[in-house]
C-alpha cells in the first residue's frame, strides 16, 4: 500500500518550497495549475488539469515520492465542470465522492510510494483548521484528513522559519502523526530530509 500524507497551509507558507532539495527522478510533481516551483531546480511540474485526468495519472507515476500540489483547485474546477449537469444540492456530494475515490485509489495502490497531497487550509469562525473546500455543502461530505494518520501544517514559527507542525498543539489544529514518529512539535520545512531521517520517517 502507498503512504498518504496531507500537508495543509496558507498560500506562501512554504508547502512547495519544501521540495527544494529533491533531485530529478526522486519526485513527481502534479498540479492542476502547472505553476513553476518557487526555487531554481531541474524539477518539472506535470500539468494534470482535472480529477478525471488525475485518476489516470496517479498509477503511472514512477518516483518514490509523488506530490499533488494545489489539490483544492481540483475540487473547484470539478465543481465548476459539473455545476450545470447535476442537481445543485447533489453536485457537492458528487465532487466529494469523486475526490475521496482518488484518495482511496492512492491508499490501495500496490506500491511503496509516498503520496503527498498539498492543499490550502481553511479556518472557521471558531478557529478550527481544515482542508479548504469550495463551500459548506462540500465540507459536510469531504474530510480528506480522516483518510490518513499523517497530517501536517505548513507555517512560519516564532523565529520566522518555515516549518511543518507535526503534533497537535490545540484541539483546533488539523495536525496528527503516529505516536513517537516525531520527537518535537515541529520539524524543518524539508520533505527530502524527512524521507531519510528517523524517527521522522515520512
Residue ranges and their predicted role:
Residues 16-17, 39, 77-78, 126-128, ...:
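Short glycine-/acidic-enriched loop or helix-start segments at secondary-structure transitions
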Residues 40-46, 54, 160-202:
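P-loop/Walker A phosphate-binding loop and immediately adjacent motor/lid segment at beta-alpha junctions
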Residues 57-58, 74-77, 109, 151-154:
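Conserved, well-folded catalytic cores of nucleic-acid-processing
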Residues 65-143:
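P-loop NTPase motor core
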Amino acid at each position: 500500500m502507498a503512504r498518504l500524507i496531507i500537508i495543509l497551509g496558507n498560500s506562501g507558507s512554504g508547502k512547495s518550497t519544501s521540495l527544494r532539495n529533491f533531485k530529478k527522478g526522486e519526485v513527481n510533481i502534479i498540479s492542476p495549475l502547472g505553476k513553476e516551483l518557487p526555487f531554481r531546480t531541474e524539477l518539472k511540474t506535470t500539468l494534470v488539469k482535472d480529477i478525471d485526468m488525475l485518476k489516470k495519472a496517479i498509477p503511472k507515476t514512477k518516483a518514490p515520492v509523488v506530490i499533488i500540489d494545489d489539490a483544492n483547485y481540483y475540487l473547484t474546477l470539478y465543481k465548476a465542470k459539473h455545476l450545470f449537469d447535476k442537481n445543485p444540492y447533489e453536485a457537492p456530494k458528487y465532487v466529494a465522492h469523486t475526490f475521496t475515490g482518488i484518495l482511496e485509489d492512492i491508499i490501495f495502490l500496490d506500491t511503496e510510494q509516498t503520496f503527498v497531497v498539498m492543499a490550502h487550509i481553511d479556518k472557521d469562525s471558531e478557529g478550527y483548521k481544515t482542508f479548504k473546500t469550495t463551500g459548506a455543502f462540500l465540507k459536510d461530505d469531504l474530510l480528506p484528513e480522516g483518510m490518513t494518520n499523517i497530517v501536517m501544517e505548513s507555517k512560519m514559527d516564532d523565529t520566522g522559519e518555515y516549518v511543518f507542525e507535526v503534533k497537535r498543539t490545540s484541539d483546533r489544529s488539523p495536525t496528527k502523526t503516529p505516536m513517537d514518529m516525531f520527537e518535537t512539535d515541529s520539524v524543518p520545512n524539508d520533505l527530502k530530509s524527512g524521507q531519510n531521517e528517523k524517527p521522522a520517517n515520512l
